[in-house]
Amino acid sequence: MNEDKDTDSKKSEEYEDDFEKDLEWLINENEKSDASIIEMACEKEENINQDLKENETVIEHTKQHSDPDKSLQDEVSPRKNDIISVPGIQPLDPISDSDSENSFQESRLESQKDLEEEEDEEVRRYIMEKIVQANKLLQNQEPVNDKRERKLKFEDKLVDLEVPPLEDTTTSKNYFENERNMFGKLSQLCISNDFGQENVLLSLTNVSCEENKDRTILVERDGKFELLNLQDIASQGFLPPINNANTTENDPQQLLPRSSNSSVSGTKKEDSAAKIHAVTHSSTGKPLAYIPQPPLNRKTCPSSAVISDQSKGNGNSNHRAQSAHISPVTSTCCLSPRQKELQKQLEQKREKLKREEERRKIEEEKEKKRENDIVFKAWLQKKREQVLEMRRIQRAKEIEDMNSRQENRDPQQAFRLWLKKKHEEQMKERQTEELRKQEECLFFLKGTEGRERAFKQWLRRKRIEKMAEQQAVRERTRQLRLEAKRSKQLQHHLYMSEAKPFRFTDHYN
């Protein structure tokens, strides 16, 4: 197992390495392509700028050429006027002016053609340069390594175990029997052109046997022929109910409209498209054909055809599906008043149950919320008790520490503490003095808001000062008491330690 795990880990590491290499290669290729695109864009911009500059120079040259022509025309016009004013001199020929204009237009057209040819040559040159660059890039690219392993690896055999489908012996036997019957019946079919179209008729030799025993007809449904019983078809709604053979013989014409109406209703309810070509044989031997109307909607396939295809795909060989007998649509139009009342009662019961369930859920949520509140309050009370206990213990420890410090305190240390406190008191006095000066400065502020703010700050500082003074007085009195107590203890010890000799003293002498 450990070896397999090692091999799997190695394979995964190799796969990750290949994936990282492929990613690096793709990133490098993208960077190269981006760089080449940027270079090409820069070159295009440079070429366009050069073309624009050349066009500007050409336009300037053409303007310069056109300016002298205009000046010449301007000079010619006063000359014409002079010529006209002189009565003895004849005017110049207007043909010379038109020739000059034509020559100027021809020169301009030639210059434009030259410019266009130069631009075309530049475009061709640019395209050839790009082709050469692309060929160089293709030559510089590394050849593709076909031997390198790819990221995805597929096994030759994806499925390890293949189980053959189960074969149902009974269904296969029924299928083969139906096929044999169908083959025997199809051999007896003949085609007649009585109604102007191809109708399949069943020619039976033994008419009496067919009427008395089988009473089956051949049905064509979606290109498949099936032998069905007349009672089954009548129960489905394709044919009217059959009581006996005489009724079918006496009323052959009533069969067509009823069956057509029933077929149309069947297509509306079940959305099925089935063509039934049936022949019923009377005692005289005259065939009677049943030709239903075509369905209204042929877009949707019948449910029986879908289920039959699924059964073939699954391996079941039932030739006829059971869904052909049962209509999938349940409409309330066919219900009786009693059934409608029962249905209403059932709906009311369902609504009542739903309301009760919602009410029960709401009550459960309220109960849970109440329980949670009780638990939270108990937890909060417990926490408060714990905090109070901790504070009590901390206060007792602080008192013990203070007592131990007072007993073991040194006079020099006490003097240092006294000096420190004095220094702190002096600092506080200085701060209070500065604050007082600031208050005096703030007193001259304009507006009520500044005065109110200053008054509030002054009150706050006064309270702080008062509390500090009270604390200092308490500390001083406590220290004085402790010092008096200690001095008494020292005096008592000194008095007891003195060794007085036992002697008689006469206080009266």
Curated annotation (Swiss-Prot):
Feature: compositional bias, Polar residues: 243-266, 300-332
Molecular function in Gene Ontology: microtubule binding
Keyword Signal appears in the UniProt entry:
no
Composition bias (Basic and acidic residues) maps to 58-82
Give the coiled coil ranges. Answer: 335-375
Gene Ontology CC terms = cytoplasm; manchette; microtubule; sperm flagellum
Q: Where is this region: Disordered?
A: 58-120, 241-332, 345-367
> Which purpose does this protein serve, as stated in its record?
Microtubule-binding protein that localizes to the microtubular manchette of elongating spermatids.
Family, according to the entry, reads as follows: Belongs to the CCDC181 family.
Q: What is this protein called?
A: Coiled-coil domain-containing protein 181
Species, as recorded: Pongo abelii
Q: What is the lineage of its organism?
A: Eukaryota, Metazoa, Chordata, Craniata, Vertebrata
